[in-house]
Amino acid sequence: MSVGLGSSGTGVSDAWGRLVLTVGFLAVAAGTVVAWQTPATAYEVSIYAATPLPFWIGASIGFLSAAVVTLRSCRDRVAGLAVVLGLVTTVTIGALPVVRSYRFYGRADPMSHLGWATEMLAGRMSFGDVFYPGGHSTTALLTDAMGVPIERGMLLVAALYFALYVVFIPLIAKALSGNRELTVIAAFSGFMVLPVNQISNGLFFHTYSMAMWFFPVFLYALVKHIRSEPAVDSITDAVMSDLADGPILDAVGAWNVVLAVLGVTLILIHPQVALNVIILLGTLVVLHAVVCRWFDLFVSDLRPVYGVFVFIALCWLVWIFQFDQVFSVGERVAVSTYEAILGTAEAGESVETRAESAQSVDASIAELFVKLFLVPSVYIALGFLMFVYTLWRSFQDADKRHLSADVDPLSRSVVTYFGYAGLVLGPFFIAHFMGPISHLFFRHYGFGMMFAIVLGAAAIHRIGVVIPEGWMKAAKPLALGLLAVALALSLLTVFTSPYIYNATHHVNDQHIDGFDTAIEHRAEDIQWSGIRNGPGREFDALVPGTVRQNRPDVIGGASTYNESELQSLLSGASDEVMYLPVSQIDVDREVIAYREVRYSEESLRRIGAQPGVHHVQSNGGFDLYYVTPRANGSDPAGVSD
């Protein structure tokens, strides 16, 4: 997998490399044009299968061209162009919902965020009404400036955040060591999009996910700051320097200011990610102030982060105490952890539930682990080994001020810092693995993978350095093969699909327009049902003033969860009339993605044939049924054809 095994002495000409990259760029461009000209016209249960084959061929050629060029040489400008090619290819794949002109992407939380962004754009909701307004306000601004629909604006904003991740992962490695080979390895590691796990994050408008994608920008600034030359030694010196000599920016340092701005930005995108950052900075403060200075366990000439830690922590406290939900989430974490310690609650309930669901469709846990977590696990292991190796070398060096020349002392200290930060963040993340909130653990897993990617890339680079020169010729094809396998395994799961026994988060025109019409013409006192889930998210997105806490009572508590409950509803067992919306999303999800484990295709297709079930609305991808109790022979009312 190492793309840094080559050297500038391999004899490859710039002309040859540029020719290969030209082919790669043209292939990616041609594939993207084909995908752009083939927009989605109906619900797509798999974005992989629905996207035209020429796009995937072009993307494969793009990655192959970039990998071949960087394997030959990582130390010239052509290698930089190869990284750009890989970056463009990765961003294009991540932005496929935009390229394919999806109406919207994201079935759960993103639908609620769509409603909030719409409210903010219309002026019915203010910036301070939302716990995490950063993404919504950016969307409102972008939508208003570009004149695009709000759904389109949200897709563009989500793609923009993802692009920041792809760009800044290699920049972190470059800031860490300045080594071009390590930078290239980190770039290709970032192309694998390892933070996505399809349990609690993804490539859609999800505020935690977007903050997670933004975090590498902060991490890059943090590395640049702690490796920079301090102008002063303390905050007191900074103030005195300002009074005596010049502007406070010169005294405090530009990177301190950048970190403060980025920290506040993270708070506004999602305060939970900002809390992770505060814990990270707090760990660095302890390491610098206590471990390094008092115990002298390892050398650190790195610049401290005292001021920015205090500033971001204070801003975080001021922001979160305006909202009640932070207390409820904190209480759930504390209670779940306490119950798990006492043995009254099981850890990983969300994981257990998903495992049972996977087994119900004949999917093994081993299969899902390979598809979702094999490559990330390799990087986690490599990152941990890199931390242990770096710490061991620091202890082994008798003269801590003159470390071995094979690794830059400052880079070694940064790696050690990150390793210790991971050890501190680990228990905090594991606390979220307890009880019914275990799904939150996989949010933090994505955050932690940012460190694993950088440290894992450093470990791969170290392996490449110690490989004997005589083995290089055989190692390069092996590295190319491992890279191809890792990219394929990883990129096949950046979107949900039947490949991982799930359906894509595509929300098509027929679904939104169908619900919009049904909601507009509804009778407000009639209860809504649903297939597996009710229409709560659709109400969030489409009904002005609706948020999750203020949904109408008629849209909750009446959904069917399996075929027997559906048949009970259709047979008139309920004592009141019901609206039953069924979209193509429901049918394809249950039949194709979930292998009819809860609902059979026949039962879903024959809903309208049941006595007392009236088919009152259809648009080719959405159907609305009016279900009457058998004792009530009333005609359909409340929704027109």
Q: What do these predicted regions represent?
A:
Residues N201-T207, A211, V232-V257, V261-A381:
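Transmembrane catalytic cores of multi-pass membrane glycosyltransferases
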Residues V3, A27-V28, Y208, F442, ...:
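Extracytoplasmic
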Residues L275-N276, Y420-L423, P436-P468:
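Hydrophobic/aromatic-rich transmembrane helices and adjacent perimembrane loops
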Residues A67, Y165-A173, F214-R227, G282-L287, ...:
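Transmembrane alpha-helical segments
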Residues V12-A15, I248-D250, F295-V305, K371-L374, ...:
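Membrane-interface helix-loop-helix junctions at transmembrane boundaries of multi-pass membrane enzymes
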Residues M1-V98, L478-G481:
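Start-transfer (signal-anchor) and selected internal transmembrane alpha helices
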Residues G86-I93, A140, D144, A158-P247, ...:
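Membrane-embedded helix bundles of polyisoprenyl
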Residues V45-A50, R75-W213, F442-F447, T504:
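Active-site lumenal/periplasmic loops and adjacent helix-entry segments of GT-C-fold
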